[in-house]
C-alpha cells in the first residue's frame, strides 16, 4: 500500500475542522489526548503516533521538533516543548504504531487548550484543564444506570426528550407476573419481579451479577461519600439521599424481590426485546434458585444493610436486609451445590436470557467468601470471620477490593489481614515494569471481549495500591499510573476514540456513535449519533478493542447478511485497533466489540470517581 506522509506541511486548516476533503483525512488522529481533559495537578502527556500496521497503515506522520500548547480562547502559545520518541521509535506491537510523548504537565491553569505540531500545523482535539473536569463525565456515566432501569417510565424530565419512553415490561405475563421458565403454563408460579437494570445491550436480568453491581456501587459510595450529591437528575433527586445510593437501591430492591421465603434466591430473568423498551410485549420468565445467586444476594443484602443503616429513613429497610442476608447465607450453606444453567441444554433452558450466569465451583466459592466478608462487617459474628479466615485464598484479582475491605476491619484477624495485604501487594508489584513499557500508558495483560473493563480494573488496581498504602511506590505515583487508564478510555488510544457514547455535548470530539444495544438498534430513532434523529443515550461505556472478534460460526454460508468477510476493523487488526463503531446483530455479532455492560460501566465509574473531589 502506498503510504501518505504528513510532515512539514501547513495543515493548520486541515483535519478536524480543517478544509481538506473528507476522503483526504486520515482515519485516526496523529496526536491523541484525553478529550475531556485533565485536572491541574495531573501528569499530562499527549501521545503522537504514526501508524505502521493496521487499517490506518497507509498514513504516516513525522512529528516536528517543537510542539505547542495553544489556549483556544486567545490563540496564545502557552508552552512549547519537544516530543520524545518512545522505545527509540520502535513499533508498538499492541497498536502497530510508532509513538512519541509530549509532556505538558507544567500547564496547570484552568482553560481550554489543544496541542499543535508547530512545523506541520497539525492540531489535536481540544481539551479542558479544570479541577472538576471529570465531574460531568462521572454524572453521565452514573446516569447510564438510570437509562438501564427496567419496568419504569423514562420521564423526559430525567431522561431528556430524546430518550423518553413509556412503561416497559409491565404488561400481562411480564415482570409484574413473571413465571418459572420450566412451567410457563402454571399461573401459580407467577411472581412480581419488577425492577433492576437491563444487564447490557440485552434486557435480561441476572441475580448474581446484579448483586455484584450493588456491592461495587456501595463500595464506590463508601470510598468517597462526599462527592455523591443528590442532583444527578434522576426521579429520586432532591430526596436528601445521595443519588448513587438511590440508583443502587433500584438494583438492590430487585434482588430483594428475587428471594424466596426459605432464604434462597432466584437466579435469572429473561425479558422480551424491542426498541424502545416499552415496545417489548412478550412474556417474562425466571430461573430457579441457586447457590451462587443466593450467596451473591447475601453479600448485597449485608452490605446494603450496613450502608443504608447509616440513614435514619432507611432503618427498617436496613433491618430487613440484615435478616435477608442471614437467611440467604443459611440456605446457601446447607445447599452448597445447587446450580442452574440458563439458555443451556444441560437444564433444558434454551431461550432463557443470553449470558451464562452460572459460575463454576471456584466462582461459587468466591461468592461465599464475599458474603461472609460483608456479613462479618455487618454483624461481627465469629462464624463469618472464621469462614473468611479459612477461605480468603479463594479470592482472586476480581476480589481484591473485597478482601481489602475485610483486611481493613478493626475486628479482622490480624494475621489474615496482613496475609491479604501481602498477597495483594505481590500481585500488584509485577505490573509496574510492564506498565512502563506501554506505548499508550495503560498496560493490560491482553485484549479480548470487554477489554475496557480490563483497562478499568487495572487502573483500579493501581488506585487500590494508593488507597491502601500497599507496595513500594508513593501514592501519587500509583494514582498517576491509574490515571493512564482513565485517559485511555477518554481517547489516549490508537483510534483517538472516547469509548463512551454520544459525549459531544460534554466535550468529546470523537466519542462512540453507535454500539450494540436492543434499544439503539440499527434503523431505530436512536441508532447512530451521525445519521439517526437522536443517537444512543450518552455515557455508555462500550466493550472496546477485541482482537478475538469474529462473525458467527458458519459465515458466510449461513446467511447473506454475513457478507464475504468479517468487518475489518475490528477483524485482522493489531490488538488496540480491533475496534469500530458498529451495532449489527446476528450473524455479524457486534456485541463482541461494542456492547455495553453494567460490569464495564461500574468498573469505569469506580475508576473515574477516584479523580473527582
What residue ranges belong to the model's regions?
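Aromatic (Trp/Tyr) and acidic
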Residues: 31-121, 143, 147-211, 215, ...
Amino acid at each position: 500500500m502506498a503510504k501518505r506522509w504528513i510532515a512539514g506541511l501547513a495543515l493548520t486548516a486541515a483535519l478536524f475542522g480543517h478544509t481538506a476533503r473528507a476522503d483526504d483525512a486520515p482515519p485516526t488522529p496523529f496526536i491523541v489526548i484525553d478529550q475531556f481533559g485533565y485536572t491541574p495537578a495531573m501528569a499530562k502527556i499527549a501521545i503522537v503516533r504514526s501508524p505502521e500496521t493496521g487499517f490506518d497503515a497507509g498514513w504516516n506522520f513525522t512529528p516536528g521538533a517543537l510542539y505547542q500548547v495553544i489556549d483556544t480562547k486567545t490563540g496564545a502559545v502557552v508552552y512549547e516543548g519537544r516530543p520524545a520518541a518512545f522505545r527509540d521509535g520502535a513499533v508498538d506491537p499492541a497498536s502497530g504504531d510508532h509513538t512519541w510523548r509530549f509532556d505538558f504537565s507544567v500547564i496547570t491553569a484552568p482553560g481550554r487548550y489543544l496541542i499543535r505540531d508547530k512545523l506541520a500545523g497539525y492540531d489535536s482535539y481540544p481539551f479542558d484543564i479544570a479541577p472538576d473536569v471529570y465531574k460531568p463525565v462521572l454524572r453521565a456515566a452514573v446516569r447510564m444506570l438510570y437509562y438501564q432501569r427496567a419496568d419504569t417510565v423514562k420521564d423526559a424530565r430525567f431522561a431528556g426528550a430524546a430518550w423518553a419512553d413509556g412503561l416497559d415490561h409491565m404488561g400481562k405475563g411480564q415482570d409484574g407476573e413473571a413465571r418459572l421458565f420450566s412451567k410457563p403454563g402454571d399461573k401459580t408460579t407467577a411472581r412480581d419481579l419488577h425492577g433492576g437494570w437491563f444487564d447490557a445491550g440485552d434486557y435480561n436480568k441476572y441475580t448474581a451479577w446484579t448483586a455484584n453491581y450493588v456491592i461495587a456501587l456501595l463500595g464506590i459510595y463508601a470510598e468517597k461519600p462526599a462527592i455523591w450529591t443528590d442532583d444527578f437528575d434522576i426521579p429520586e433527586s432532591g430526596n436528601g439521599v445521595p443519588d448513587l445510593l438511590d440508583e443502587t437501591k433500584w438494583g438492590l430492591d430487585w434482588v430483594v424481590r428475587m428471594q424466596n421465603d426459605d432464604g434462597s434466591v432466584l437466579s435469572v430473568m429473561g425479558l422480551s426485546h424491542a426498541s424502545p423498551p416499552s415496545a417489548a410485549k412478550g412474556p417474562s420468565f425466571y430461573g430457579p434458585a441457586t447457590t451462587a445467586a443466593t450467596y451473591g444476594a447475601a453479600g448485597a443484602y449485608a452490605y446494603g444493610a450496613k450502608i443504608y443503616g447509616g440513614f435514619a429513613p432507611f432503618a427498617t429497610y436496613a433491618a430487613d436486609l440484615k435478616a435477608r442476608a442471614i437467611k440467604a447465607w443459611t440456605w446457601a450453606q446447607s445447599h452448597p451445590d445447587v446450580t442452574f444453567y440458563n439458555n443451556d441444554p444441560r437444564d433444558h433452558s434454551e431461550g432463557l436470557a443470553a449470558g451464562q450466569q452460572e459460575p463454576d465451583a471456584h466462582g461459587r466459592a468466591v461468592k461465599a467468601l464475599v458474603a461472609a466478608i460483608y456479613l462479618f462487617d455487618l454483624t461481627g459474628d465469629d462464624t463469618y470471620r472464621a469462614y473468611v479466615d479459612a477461605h480468603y485464598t479463594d479470592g482472586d484479582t476480581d476480589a481484591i477490593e473485597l478482601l481489602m475491605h475485610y483486611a481493613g476491619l478493626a475486628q479482622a484477624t490480624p494475621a489474615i489481614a496482613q496475609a491479604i495485604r501481602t498477597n495483594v501487594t505481590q500481585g500488584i508489584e509485577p505490573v509496574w515494569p510492564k506498565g512502563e513499557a506501554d506505548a499508550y500508558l495503560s498496560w493490560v495483560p491482553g485484549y479480548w471481549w470487554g477489554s475496557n473493563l480490563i483497562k478499568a480494573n487495572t487502573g483500579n488496581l493501581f488506585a487500590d495500591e494508593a488507597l491502601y498504602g500497599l507496595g513500594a511506590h508513593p501514592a501519587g505515583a500509583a494514582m498517576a499510573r491509574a490515571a493512564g487508564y482513565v485517559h485511555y478510555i477518554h481517547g489516549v488510544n490508537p483510534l483517538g476514540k472516547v469509548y463512551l457514547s454520544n459525549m459531544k455535548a460534554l466535550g468529546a470530539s470523537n466519542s462512540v456513535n453507535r454500539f450494540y444495544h436492543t434499544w439503539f438498534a440499527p434503523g431505530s430513532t436512536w441508532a447512530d449519533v451521525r445519521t439517526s434523529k437522536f443517537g444512543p443515550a450518552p455515557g455508555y461505556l462500550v466493550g472496546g478493542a477485541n482482537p478475538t472478534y469474529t462473525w458467527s460460526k458458519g459465515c458466510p454460508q449461513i446467511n447473506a447478511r454475513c457478507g464475504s468477510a468479517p468487518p475489518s476493523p475490528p477483524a485482522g487488526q493489531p490488538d488496540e485497533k480491533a475496534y469500530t463503531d458498529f451495532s449489527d446483530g446476528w450473524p455479524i455479532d457486534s456485541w463482541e466489540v461494542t456492547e455495553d455492560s453494567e460490569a464495564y460501566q461500574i468498573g469505569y465509574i469506580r475508576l473515574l470517581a477516584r479523580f473527582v473531589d
